[in-house]
Amino acid sequence: MTLTENVMKPQIQRFTRDHDPKVLWQVVEEDGAVIIEGFLPHEVIQKFDCELDVRSKATKGGEMNQEFYQMPVPTTTKWMNDLTATCPTFRHEILNNDILHSLCNVAFEPHGDYWLLNGMAMEMMPGNPTQQIHNDHGTHPILQYLRPDAPAPVFSIITAVTEFTESNGATRVILGSHRWPQGQKAKDDQAVRAALQPGDALVMHRSTKHGGAAHDADNQDHRRLLLTCMGTCQLAPYETNVTVPRPIVESMTPLAQKMIGWRSTRPVISNVTGLNTVRMKHLENQIELKSNVPLNVGGC
């Protein structure tokens, strides 16, 4: 796809981070995607990128846990999970981001409380191949049986840690594909690119077709992103955080603790018992969980 062909198509709408979250979510529901410029402040992205430098050095490309399913993965991609335990910026600043929660409050109003289903960093290196176009609800197959007009139970956010350009594989997005009938095949020429600056975020409906593009071998940039999947608390997280050391959890805010499953949640009525409880009581009270306790851990 050439740049000229890309420009001739309707593009992903862009808004600044101070825009009304109700409008932002309305665009997601109508178009399937929206770009929020400055979703994460520059200083937050800088610190997070610094922490990922450490993770990246200890991570080999092409290594992905395949205990559940065997599939080929490119050696030019690194996957970095367990961000709550290993990245202070993720647990203290990203999980408390005001724009994130404003958007979640709008999106999940029909469902009640929400939490983090997945938080994962990725790094794509020169020569990384084109990613197959897909949507992000494959982790929870039950979602495919929802009515098309059902309130959104989940959405995805791709935040640029480094710049996204055409030559380093900026994400391809097919606007309107979230309204397609099940089984409709995507074509590459239907996609537009999500060019992003560090800190910009691409917010997508759960059914929107998208995929990374090829990273030119002669472009020596390493493209990094943060993929966060937010969902109603009625869905089990893709990645559990029960293994995060308690002192780390207790250094976090109550809101961030709820995001990683260390507090009970409250869906809307008809649920009258809460979820993630102990003997029908609040988890955090039963385990005497503290919060905002300083943790003596060095940053980067």
Swiss-Prot record:
Q: What happens when the gene is disrupted?
A: Abolishes the production of okaramine B and leads to the accumulation of okaramines A and H.
Disulfide-bonded cysteine pairs: these are none
- Catalytic activity reported: okaramine A + 2-oxoglutarate + AH2 + O2 = 12-deshydroxyl okaramine E + succinate + A + CO2 + H2O; 12-deshydroxyl okaramine E + 2-oxoglutarate + O2 = okaramine E + succinate + CO2; okaramine A + 2-oxoglutarate + O2 = okaramine E + succinate + CO2
Q: In which pathway does it act?
A: Alkaloid biosynthesis; Secondary metabolite biosynthesis; terpenoid biosynthesis
Which cofactor is essential here?
Answer: Fe cation
Q: Which GO terms describe its biological process?
A: biosynthetic process
Spell out the InterPro entries in the cross-references: Phytyl_CoA_dOase-like
Q: In the record, what terms sit under GO molecular function?
A: dioxygenase activity; metal ion binding
Domain of life the protein comes from: Eukaryota
Tell me which EC number(s) this protein carries.
Answer: 1.14.20.-
Q: Which Pfam families match?
A: PhyH
UniProt keywords, alphabetically: Dioxygenase, Iron, Metal-binding, Oxidoreductase
Residues involved in Fe cation binding: H134, D136, H210
Per UniProt, subunit arrangement is: Homodimer.
What does this gene product do?
A: Iron/alpha-ketoglutarate-dependent dioxygenase; part of the gene cluster that mediates the biosynthesis of okaramine B, a prenylated indole alkaloid that possesses an unusual octacyclic ring system, including a four-membered azetidine ring and an eight-membered azocine ring, and that exhibits insecticidal activity against silkworm larvae. Within the pathway, okaE forms the unusual 2-dimethyl-3-methyl-azetidine ring to yield 12-deshydroxyl okaramine E from okaramine A. OkaE also catalyzes the hydroxylation of 12-deshydroxyl okaramine E to produce okaramine E.
Family membership noted in the UniProt record: Belongs to the PhyH family.
Q: What is this protein called?
A: Iron/alpha-ketoglutarate-dependent dioxygenase okaE
Which organism encodes this protein? Penicillium ochrochloron
